[in-house]
Amino acid sequence: MRFNIDLLSNDSLTKENFNKIFFKTHSAQNKQYFTDEIYNSFKRVLTPTFHMQNDGNFIEYNKKQKEIISKPIKEMRVKGVFGSGKTTTLVARAVKTYQKLKMDKLHPKILILTYNLTLRNFIRDKLIQVHRDFEIVDFTIINYHQFIKAELNNMEIEMEIPHKNKGMEIEEYYDKYYSNEQLFAKNKDKIIPYDAIYIDEIQDYKRSWMNIIKDSFLAPEGEYIIFGDEKQNIYGNPIKNKDIITNILGRPTELKICHRSDSKIRDLTLEFQKTLFSKKYELDNMVNEKIGEGLFEKEGYTKYTYFLNMPIIPTIYDIIRENILHKIHNVSPNDITILGYTLPLLRELDCYYRILSRENTKTMFETTEIMYLSALSDNEKWLDALRNELARNNYPNNTKLSDEQNIKIKKFIAQLLSIAELYAKYPEKIEKCFSEKCENFKIGFDFFLSFLKTNAKEIQGFRSKVNKANYEIIRRNKKIHFWMNCGMLKISTIHSFKGWESQAVFLIIEDKTTKNEFDELLYTGFTRARENLVIINFGNEEYHKILKPMFDKVNKQ
């Protein structure tokens, strides 16, 4: 044989076997194909660009923001009302500190931490808007769990993943690796510290996480500054004296100016605080940004709707489309977001919305089509029959399909099964779109309905398997690659959208909620809206009694 081939299967792909083959090849020899010259070429091309001052935007900071950005202090906690520009201030402070450190150090190490995976891109966007010179490569922007995982890998500490060690519960796994202060203290000599560390959304952090970051990853004389809003404490972290507990002593520096001071959203949020948070948190004492505030009509559109005993998905869709087309018709789809808190409802709504509106959406979770597509490698008779029918109709002259054509057929099947699932629930609403989809994919509508009926039992079993599968990797990947300016309407859980903002938000409340931290979750959903907020409540009488008077009061002002 001319080639030396090593084959690893699912059973034989272990760390030991991989390393054995890796070092058996040229990788372990001095004369490597991957030379220093090639390495340096890759490094040169992939190195992030230097950020010039002119690349950023000129941002006019208010007096308090300027104070926080320039204050000569090594440790600070910043507390800000919603819409006060906490993240904008954070990145400006980070760049200001970087420039000071740059005088004595060629490449200062700056760490910006989040909790929410999707916020990395948001913070990076904010960073490149700063009107200063800096090298982006010197800034690490990452969420806590990915950061700890990477650092443990650097320390050569192997993590025992729960599904590999069935005796270890998930909670024990997180405590052992992500909350274990002693683990990092023992291995501190293996850690390369950061010159400055900034944490956004600090209310999401456990106290042990704060201690690990500050005690083990901060350089001596390093800067440690944290930002947050305790009223968005959606994970139920401990509260003392109406405030979250952190590892910085003393009262926080406060950002009190809400940049939405003339909006109904601000008034609605303050009413929410008075009604639900007065005994738990300090209420926001906002400072008016604009002179004459209150003399003119409030900006924005707020609406509350309550429904009982109606089909949820079609009703939500009708309300959203009615508001988009007639109330906020001047808002781009790019600036509209639908928020909820249960994935099954949001997935079905996403599929229904795309099919009926014929518009694309952006989600932070798996779509119904992706779920079906990921399971289409199964060899089942009914699936083979459907594949063959679509292949014959779409490629009549091909005896064998190319890889690209096979993938296309799979996508057809995934879309057909998705729309068929909706058709079973809402036949009158979906029939026209379903028929058009069948025509586009060159399969008879009546034929496909007959096919679904004949194979109903097998398809139901297939759907059950699809719904039970784990899609965590897909969700993580979609969150990592989420960008706000994608040109499409977004659909997300409140948790995943935390930290982001949207011009118009449709917030869905279902009939059943978990009371623990739901007030904070709802408040977080409220504050994602910059100007327009529509609440759609399906049968949750407890929150109906709270929210309706609130909206009535604000809308009468």
Residue ranges, per PLM feature:
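N-terminal accessory nucleic-acid engagement/regulatory domains that precede
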Residues: 1-44
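N-terminal pre-P-loop "Q-motif" helix
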Residues: 33-44, 49-74, 81, 89
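Short, surface-exposed amphipathic charged segments that create phosphate/polyanion-binding patches used
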Residues: 15-28, 75, 151-164, 267-273, ...
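Conserved RecA-like ASCE ATPase "motif II neighborhood" in helicase/translocase motors
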Residues: 152-216, 489-496
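Conserved helicase motor core of SF1/SF2 NTP-dependent helicases
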Residues: 58, 63, 76-109, 114-130, ...
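Conserved nucleotide-sensing/catalytic segment adjacent to the nucleotide-binding pocket
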Residues: 135
